[in-house]
Amino acid sequence: MLELGAGLGLPSLAAAVRGADVLATDWAEDAVELLRRNAERNGIALRAEVVRWDEPAPLVGEAPWRLVLGADLLYERRNADQLLELLPRLGGDALLADPGRPFAKGFLERAAARWEIETATDGTIALHRLRLR
């Protein structure tokens, strides 16, 4: 399992506790370091790496990923653009949680050309499941 934009990595930590082989990634070195320390302190085995979406060789090299997770990623247009380029190269399904960021709607409209998209929402957070066609 791959998490993009992991930040503190709660989804990655939870998946690793349940036995998943996890790579948690973020562009911010300090976030990745905190995630590593948290995993180590709690005896959780996972990998955490600094990766930029515009330099995805480490991620693509391990593709296909069975599952790609991301939460609150679509707050900038460049994130939406880079994610549209990157996701098809990773393979597998993607689960993206979004709190209604401004670029989510456009991202989903463009993604629908290549992906089947299912959305569930509680009125605050939307969870989008993307499957390559």
Predicted regions and their residues:
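S-adenosylmethionine-dependent methyltransferases
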Residues: 1-133
